[in-house]
């Protein structure tokens, strides 16, 4: 049997030692890897917060008056946040302010991400509706229905209860009391909520312009006529002056928009004179103001009605329906000379009334 030399024994020793050391290092690495993996799993199971912006979608409804405890519970129940206490502490530390509304959120959101959504009113889900100046109630109901999906008949039905909106007793309908503007309504808003907001906005405008409540109805009535007649901003104040002058001398207003008006939307120009007299809105027939507004006046029409420019005009006619150019006159003869320009424009634009 061959004997191993001392030099060979030394080489074997070092080789064996290296193998043992390598195995030890591998074992240590495996243990370390297992520890890191287990630790990550443990933290994932025990952490008090989700990571990131979340996933999926869920709507959370915040009501007016909800406090931090209730808001936190709603988020927890909806699966938005993971832990009640940690989110509630965030609210306390942030001096949180909440805004009522419906918020589109995600499932499994981090506390910070969830808080950022709720802390801004602009994140609430809303309907944006623009009601132009001069729209009549029937048009407003249709526009609101188109945007919100609430049937126009429901708006009309809700509008019948005038006492619920604090409208003056002399008003027979809600016509004229719905302020024309751009609104953002909560997606959960009812027909009554929406109309109530519009009436409140009109009241605010009347108060801002210094109109006493006893004069609300008459002011809105005249302003609605000014709104339907005037085309260009400077002319609002002149049209207002024409009507003020006519009222002062007991002259009929004789304004075309009152001929067609009815709350239901029916064109009253197509009914008999007897029906028009009974209806009471045709200012070519009645004396003074009609029973109520014929449309929703905006801020400009209200201001012009309250502050007509100085002048002694009794007549006006828009001679260019496209540009809105309007002529004002003191006498009937002067007025009729201006009407000639309108007739000429109509001949040059024969399809205008069909568009």
Locations of the language-model features?
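Conserved catalytic or metal-liganding residues and their short signature motifs at active sites
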Residues: 1-254, 297-300, 304-312, 320-355
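Conserved SxxK-family serine transpeptidase/carboxypeptidase catalytic domain
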Residues: 251-301
């Amino acid at each position: 049997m061959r004997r191993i030399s001392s030099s060979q024994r030394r080489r074997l020793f070092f080789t064996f030692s290296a193998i043992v050391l390598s195995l030890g290092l591998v074992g240590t690495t495996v243990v370390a890897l297992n520890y890191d993996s287990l630790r990550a799993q443990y933290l994932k199971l025990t952490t008090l917060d989700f990571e990131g912006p979340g996933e999926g979608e869920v709507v959370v409804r915040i009501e007016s008056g909800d406090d931090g405890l209730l808001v936190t519970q709603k988020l927890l129940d909806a699966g938005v946040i993971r832990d009640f206490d940690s989110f509630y502490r965030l609210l306390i530390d942030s001096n949180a302010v909440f805004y009522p509304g419906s918020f589109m959120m995600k499932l499994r959101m981090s506390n910070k991400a969830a808080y950022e959504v709720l802390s801004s009113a602009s994140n609430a889900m809303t309907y944006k509706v623009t009601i132009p100046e001069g729209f009549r109630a029937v048009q407003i109901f249709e526009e609101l229905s188109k945007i919100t999906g609430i049937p126009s008949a429901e708006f009309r039905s809700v509008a019948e209860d005038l006492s619920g909106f604090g409208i003056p007793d002399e008003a027979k309908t809600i016509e004229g009391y719905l302020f024309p503007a751009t609104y953002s309504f909560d997606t959960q808003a009812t027909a009554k909520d929406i109309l109530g907001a519009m009436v409140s906005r009109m009241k605010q405008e009347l108060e801002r312009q210094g109109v006493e409540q006893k004069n609300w109805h008459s002011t809105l009535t005249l302003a609605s006529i000014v709104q339907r007649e005037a085309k260009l901003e400077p002319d609002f104040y002149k049209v207002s002056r024409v009507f003020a002058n006519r009222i002062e001398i007991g002259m009929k207003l004789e304004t075309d928009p009152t001929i067609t008006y009815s709350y239901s939307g029916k064109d009253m120009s197509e009914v008999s004179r007897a029906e028009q007299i009974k209806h009471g809105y045709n200012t070519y027939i009645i004396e003074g103001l009609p029973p109520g507004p014929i449309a929703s006046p905006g801020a400009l029409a209200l201001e012009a009605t309250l502050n007509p420019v100085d002048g002694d005009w009794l007549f006006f006619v828009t001679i260019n329906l496209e540009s809105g150019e309007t002529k004002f006159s003191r006498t009937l003869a002067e007025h009729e000379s201006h009407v000639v320009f309108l007739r000429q424009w109509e001949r040059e634009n024969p399809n205008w009334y069909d568009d």
